[in-house]
């Protein structure tokens, strides 16, 4: 701590109002209620009895990895990957363009029936809408 900060701390009386309010600050009764970010898995009754609700308990699903050859470790000495991020143009040219070219050569391409290639004319009913955007980036 610097000299000026120590002098300023001596001049200011009372609690430090600039530091972050965590579960370690405050009186013991408050610290017991504040918690550390864990979700509740039940509730307390009027007789101070805790009732656990089965649906609120997190359930971890772990796959069976017997016979799996890869190890869950990547060495920090491993070389950086050389792949560039996938763009929309690359995705279109790899996934949709071959089917459109094939239909165009066969004479069966219909510009009014683009749903065949995965085009969605409306975003209604979608959980994440691209326009108007309804999700955080």
Swiss-Prot record:
BP GO terms, sorted: apoptotic process; mitochondrial translation; translation
Cell location: Mitochondrion
Main location: mitochondrion
Tissue distribution: Present in kidney, liver, thymus and testis, and at lower level in brain and spleen (at protein level).
Keyword Cell cycle in record: yes
Transit peptide location on this chain: 1-13
One GO cellular component term noted in the UniProt record for this chain: ribonucleoprotein complex
Keyword Transit peptide applies: yes
Key words, A-Z: Apoptosis, Cell cycle, Mitochondrion, Ribonucleoprotein, Ribosomal protein, Transit peptide
A Pfam match: MRP-L27
Disulphide bridges: none
Single annotated GO MF: RNA binding
Assembly: Component of the mitochondrial large ribosomal subunit (mt-LSU). Mature mammalian 55S mitochondrial ribosomes consist of a small (28S) and a large (39S) subunit. The 28S small subunit contains a 12S ribosomal RNA (12S mt-rRNA) and 30 different proteins. The 39S large subunit contains a 16S rRNA (16S mt-rRNA), a copy of mitochondrial valine transfer RNA (mt-tRNA(Val)), which plays an integral structural role, and 52 different proteins. Interacts with BCL2.
Function statement: Component of the mitochondrial ribosome large subunit. Also involved in apoptosis and cell cycle. Enhances p53/TP53 stability, thereby contributing to p53/TP53-induced apoptosis in response to growth-inhibitory condition. Enhances p53/TP53 translocation to the mitochondria. Has the ability to arrest the cell cycle at the G1 phase, possibly by stabilizing the CDKN1A and CDKN1B (p27Kip1) proteins.
Membership in a protein family: Belongs to the mitochondrion-specific ribosomal protein mL41 family.
Name of the featured protein: Large ribosomal subunit protein mL41
Source species: Homo sapiens (Human)
């Amino acid at each position: 701590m610097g000299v000026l900060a120590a002098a300023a701390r001596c001049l200011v009386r009372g609690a430090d109002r600039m530091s972050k309010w965590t579960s370690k600050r405050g009186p013991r009764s408050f610290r017991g209620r504040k918690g550390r970010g864990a979700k509740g898995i039940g509730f307390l009754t009027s007789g101070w009895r805790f009732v656990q609700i089965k649906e609120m308990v997190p359930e971890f699903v772990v796959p069976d990895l017997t016979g799996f050859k890869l190890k869950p470790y990547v060495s920090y000495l491993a070389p950086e990957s050389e792949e560039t991020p996938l763009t929309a143009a690359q995705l279109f040219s790899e996934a949709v363009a071959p089917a459109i070219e094939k239909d165009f050569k066969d004479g069966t391409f219909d510009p009014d029936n683009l749903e065949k290639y995965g085009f969605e004319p409306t975003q209604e009913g979608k959980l994440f809408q691209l326009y108007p955007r309804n999700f955080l980036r």
